[in-house]
A protein has these predicted regions:
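Periplasmic-binding protein-like
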Residues: 58-65, 132-136, 140-180, 196-205
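Ligand-binding cleft/hinge of the Venus flytrap
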Residues: 4-13, 90-111, 139-144
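Extended ligand-binding regions for polar small-molecule ligands
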Residues: 1-10, 80-81, 88-89, 161-198
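Extracytoplasmic small-molecule ligand-binding "clamshell" domains
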Residues: 1-40, 185
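Short loop->beta-strand "edge-of-pocket" segments that line small-molecule binding or catalytic clefts
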Residues: 75-91, 105
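Flexible hinge/capping segments at coil-to-helix
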Residues: 54, 65-82
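Short helix-initiation/N-cap motifs at beta->coil->alpha
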Residues: 16-27, 69, 107-122, 158
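A ligand-binding cleft/hinge motif common to bilobed small-molecule-binding domains
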Residues: 24, 40-49, 93-98, 121-122, ...
Length: 205
């Protein structure tokens, strides 16, 4: 959100965050109700459906565990209770990895990650499968963030980009140039560090 705000400000455009129903995103974009989709929008598998910025962030699907759990890798998840948000990229990645999920004691879904972290804190589950970007944000925003660790092994990787209506190169180019300027002057890294505790951006690298 802050990244999009800064881009709009530099371009002299009014920033209007518009919540949408995710399954209506194409209709909203094609009708002109929104100008772009900029919300953890995965490029993979959609490369030809939109006019894209270059990827601004790499995202992986990972597991979060408590620091004292003794879980250090995928093998340690055998027999454990794993939770994942319903209809998330992490759930899709788990469905594609039956060899791994077959070792779990239980794989269950949750409606949101706040609930998942409460379950993990209470010991109701042993691990949460989720986006590394969201994991970093959740952990960074918690007073007890040092209680949690992200396993180094990753389930899958994807790239985040900004999706514009097919053919809208003019706005894409304006946004892209501004993002490159922000990467060069350190603003991208600064915003990323504020929200995620580290620089997770990829533009200009």
């Amino acid at each position: 959100l802050e990244l999009a705000q800064e881009v709009a400000k530099r371009l002299g455009l009014e920033f209007v965050p518009q919540p949408i129903a995710w399954d209506a995103k194409d209709m909203e974009l094609n009708s002109g109700t929104i100008d772009c989709i900029w919300n953890g929008f995965t490029m993979n598998g959609r490369e030809d459906d939109y006019t894209w910025s270059t990827p601004y962030m790499d995202n992986s699907q990972v597991f979060v565990v408590t620091a004292d759990s003794g879980i250090e890798n995928f093998a340690d998840l055998a027999g454990k209770i794993v939770e994942v948000q319903a209809d998330s990229s992490a759930e899709a990645a788990l469905k594609d990895n039956e060899e791994l999920t077959g070792t779990f004691g239980t794989l269950q879904t949750t409606p949101d990650y706040n609930t998942a972290f409460m379950d993990l804190e209470m010991g109701a589950v042993d691990a949460i499968a989720m986006d590394v970007i969201v994991a970093g944000y959740q952990i960074e925003q918690r007073d007890d963030g040092d209680k949690y660790v992200v396993l180094e092994e990753t389930l899958a990787s994807e790239e985040y980009g900004i999706g514009f209506k097919k053919g809208n190169e003019e706005l894409r180019d304006q946004v892209q140039t501004t993002l490159e300027d922000m990467a060069a002057d350190g603003t991208l890294a600064e915003i990323s560090d504020k929200w995620f505790g580290r620089d997770v951006t990829t533009i200009g690298k």
